[in-house]
Amino acid sequence: MRHIGPSLEDQQQMLLELGHRDLQSFVAAVVPPDILETTAPSSSLPEGCGEVQAMEELRLIAAANRVRRSLIGLGYYGTATPALIQRQVLENPAWYTAYTPYQAEISQGRLEALFNFQTLISELTGLPIANASLLDEGTAAAEAMSLSFAICKRPAAHRFLVDAEVLPQTLAVLRTRAEPLGIDLEVAEPMTFQFDAEVFGVLLQLPGRSGRLWDPTTSIQAAHEVGALATVAIDPLAQVLLAPVAEFGADIAVGSVQRFGVPMGFGGPHAAFFATLEIFKRQVPGRLVGQSVDAEGQPALRLALQTREQHIRRDKATSNICTAQVLLAVMASFYAVHHGPDGLAAIARRVLRLRAQLERGLHQLGYPVQSIARFDTIEVICREAPAVHQAAALAGFNLRVLPLGVAPEAAHGFGISFDELSTDQELKSILQILAEAAGQPVPVLEDPGNPHLEELVGLPLRQRPWLQQQVFHRYRSETELLRYLQRLVGRDLSLVHGMIPLGSCTMKLNAAAELIPISWREFAALHPFAPQDQCQGYQRLVQDLEHWFADITGFAGVSLQPNAGSQGELAGLLVIRAWHHSRGEQQRDVCLIPTSAHGTNPATCVMAGLRVVPVACDADGNVDLNDLASKAEAHAPQLAALMVTYPSTHGVFEPQIREICELVHGHGGQVYLDGANLNAQIGFCRPGTYGADVCHINLHKTFCIPHGGGGPGVGPIAVSAHLMPFLPGHPLAACGGEQGIGAISAAPWGSAGILPISWMYLRMMGAEGLRQASAVALLSANYLAHRLHPHYPVLFRGQAGLVAHECILDLRPLKRSAGLEVDDIAKRLMDYGFHAPTVSWPVAGTVMVEPTESESLEELNRFCDAMIAIREETAAIESGQIDPQNNPLRRAPHTLAAVTAEVWDRPYSRAEAAFPLAEQRQSKFWPAVSRIDNAYGDRNLLCSCPSVEELADNAVLKPPLV
């Protein structure tokens, strides 16, 4: 079983060191006996198999998807992923196995790619602050609504005005998110908006769903006059030609860069964006990359303004977004680098020209077409619509069915959206279909030659040069772009270099066989709103995963729609809330949360319209049962739920988990189990059988979807039978429960395009393989704790003195004895070739280590050797052998440039700095920059590449290093 790192012989050696004879007895000592299933539970999972067989089976499933040319639009478009980007980024483990770039000194490659992404978005929108991606356009619009609501200080302001032309999936997500917050959505034509003091924000769509282009300046000014913020949802390809929305007065711009080289993937994953004014920089959701300087005074990139994020602000955060869509944002940024501004403009002009020619053809054929400015889309209401759809289907095209959601044979109209893949031949085929349906000869259109922008007359167009930064012009040849990609990826530490022992993150193997199918056309090229008979492969994939996850977790039903763990949390709490409301218990609005919980939990509670009541933890890191009982009783009439992580965020199996669940149920509440640590449980205990009502599952942790440097993620929820009627639905697809909470993500099945990864993992492992993986994950964590405990105190242990799948090492004594902070240890680990464990969470001054089952005994020992060697270095400080200020830890990490500089004025040798372990002379990963000054970066926030003019005017500004 190649997924599991330690061999059987290595496992036996590890067990002997821990004093256990076999894995079965070891697991029995770790997992509380009242929840332990001593034999593998019956499972719908087939027996595990090899990668060849699994891939052959998945090929048959993929073949059931019939890919047609979809011109449906609605936010999803055909696009050409440059082969170099597909091969060197999407399919490159050095890009997709990295973690969120919290350790910036070893993350400079993807930070630069994200910096380029933010620059692209700022240039498109004209707004100075753009984040490093969001989950999808619907979520981005909802985040804009929440930000506008949070910023508005008028108590009476509760109305959010929405353009009637907004995308239907965006409107659905807005409705789901607005109701718990007490926001009233009003959908209307912008010219009929009724503005007063109750309005806190507006959302406009440009172009609109029907393709309409218009000047929103008047509507934005009207919003500003009553103190409301204006958000504009934009199409980035249209924005290439149009004036930046900042020139219309927009406060916020949102959208998706899917059509910048990211496949449709049946709805995702795609990178959304969020851009705004500088005054709102501390309210921006998600990650924000900023430029700072390192210890040598060189420019360096890092995540900026981190104190505004949910893991810091908790219930005071305006967003619960954690994982975003970094890998897809990176792809889109390289797409822009690949094409440059001229190439992007050429694509946009071609799309505009084809749409204009189609419109002329429609007029000639007698179809009723309204004369308005448009970009890529035309909608037509006509009696010939059923015949048009029938002929289009026979010719291999999917057109938009109007009204949305009806069957083609009942259609009153059709819509056509052109995209990057559209050609003159495609236009001719469409005109032939339309002519046949109308009983007219095919119109002959004159070749307009070089397309002009007369089709957009009357609209403000982009006048000034844009994307003038060198990076968008320098890499015109594939050779140069290939080398640029290689330079960047060489500045990032990922799983291709070594273990990433981040606690609560489960950085396990992402096998090549699991990743290959996501590039298959049958999965990558399918539109999420394609006719159901064309999507049978995806339906089978979804059905398999829903059944398997329900079995694994012990629940009755599953929704795959949430496209991140944060969205799984929100979906789970909203499902609980809807169940209470269905029983007439609207007063239940209290959520109990242990103080050790991840910051996402309290932030999510607030978004779900619940009040957070903290519950204390005892000295052993467990939920304090007395405090829980007291709080549950005090709030019994209002108790909605308890959010609990299991095993706990302190890395132990709490023995009283059944009692905790029963206590909450006894007071009328439901139990939401955060599935971040599910990797410790698979095959041995199931949340649905020991008392939980809802559990979210991180497929990007337990089930092998790679972290992608900060996304994509997938966060399905599994629920008990009584909650199934409330699972998330969608306006354009049959999914969810009869009383579903509404859409939580823009696409019906969320990030469906990466579900084949988890399917392959589950199919290859089988039930017994999953059980073995969890056992080895527990074994590896306890082996590390055993080896490191003589050098660093292990802060919490469960029964029999054992930890779960991770352990917390207490570094606080080093502050007292050697003046060292936990960051000093984290940065020094880079010199040893390791990414640091999770720093200062859940306990400040500690590190949380999670090795996973995929790391070999050799790699586990290499990490232990590094940590022990660092402890010896700290001991030298304690004994006075080395300077307490000027030493390898305080000045870590050490770059190649620093170590090879002509002048070396440090009281330790270059070898001690760069090669603390002898083995590193054979293979060494070098940090790209020295320690970064985070405070400087926040005080001097720079979130996009300076323009040529800015560089000329300000000698202080420097572009990134590469």
Curated annotation (Swiss-Prot):
GO terms for cellular component: cytosol; glycine cleavage complex. CDD domains: GDC-P. The glycine cleavage system is composed of four proteins: P, T, L and H. One of its GO terms (molecular function) is glycine dehydrogenase (decarboxylating) activity. One of its GO terms (biological process) is glycine decarboxylation via glycine cleavage system. Its EC number is 1.4.4.2. InterPro entries: GcvP, GDC-P_C, GDC-P_N, GDC_P, PyrdxlP-dep_Trfase, PyrdxlP-dep_Trfase_major, PyrdxlP-dep_Trfase_small. This is Glycine dehydrogenase (decarboxylating). Its cofactor is pyridoxal 5'-phosphate. It catalyses: N(6)-[(R)-lipoyl]-L-lysyl-[glycine-cleavage complex H protein] + glycine + H(+) = N(6)-[(R)-S(8)-aminomethyldihydrolipoyl]-L-lysyl-[glycine-cleavage complex H protein] + CO2. The glycine cleavage system catalyzes the degradation of glycine. The P protein binds the alpha-amino group of glycine through its pyridoxal phosphate cofactor; CO(2) is released and the remaining methylamine moiety is then transferred to the lipoamide cofactor of the H protein. The keyword Oxidoreductase applies. The modification N6-(pyridoxal phosphate)lysine is found at K701. Belongs to the GcvP family. Keywords: Oxidoreductase, Pyridoxal phosphate.
